[in-house]
């Protein structure tokens, strides 16, 4: 039993990681210190940010090496914070282009006052993270094209209402409906 556990789940001190997974982590750690890889990653992320910025998408600037952050509050300036402009953009990107992103705004960080009114987060951002070794140039170009449609239809987006939320960490499991 112990031998099979080590083969399939890894040694007890590996934290449940198999040898294959630990090798993948080691390769990843080596790759991220390669100057050529780092340059490629940063240039790819900046390319995405620059191209959508040129189209008029408000982003946090300058762009870093991991992700592009879209300012959903500025993009959807007609949507009040209590209708969650960041989450609305997350949903639009997924529905229009199948692009998975994450809201970093009032869904994630908003709270309620004693009267049950939303205390909005200071920013309504959407993170377009670029995972390592996953996307090619054509994938990045596709995301840029999807923003053409997002911009074309932005006034039609009215926001969302939370219809079900847990007490804690609501950004993981809340349910929404379109307004």
Language model: regions and residue ranges:
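Active-site C-terminal subdomain of aminotransferase-like
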Residues: 1-86, 91
């Amino acid at each position: 039993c112990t031998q099979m556990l080590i083969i399939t789940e890894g040694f007890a001190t590996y934290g449940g990681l198999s040898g294959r997974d630990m090798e993948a982590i080691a390769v990843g750690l080596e790759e991220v210190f390669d100057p050529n890889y780092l340059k490629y990653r940063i240039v790819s992320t900046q390319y995405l940010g620059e191209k959508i910025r040129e189209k008029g998408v408000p982003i946090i600037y300058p762009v870093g090496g991991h992700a592009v952050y879209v300012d959903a509050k500025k993009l959807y300036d007609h949507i009040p914070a209590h209708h969650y402009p960041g989450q609305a953009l997350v949903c639009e990107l997924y529905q229009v282009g199948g692009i998975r992103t994450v809201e970093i705004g009032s869904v994630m960080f908003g709270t309620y006052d004693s009267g049950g009114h939303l205390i909005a987060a200071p920013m309504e951002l959407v993170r377009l993270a670029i995972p390592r070794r996953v996307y090619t140039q054509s994938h990045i170009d596709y995301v840029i094209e999807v923003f053409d449609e997002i911009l074309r239809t932005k006034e039609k987006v009215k926001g969302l209402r939370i219809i079900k939320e847990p007490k804690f960490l609501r950004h993981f499991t809340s349910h929404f409906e379109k307004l």
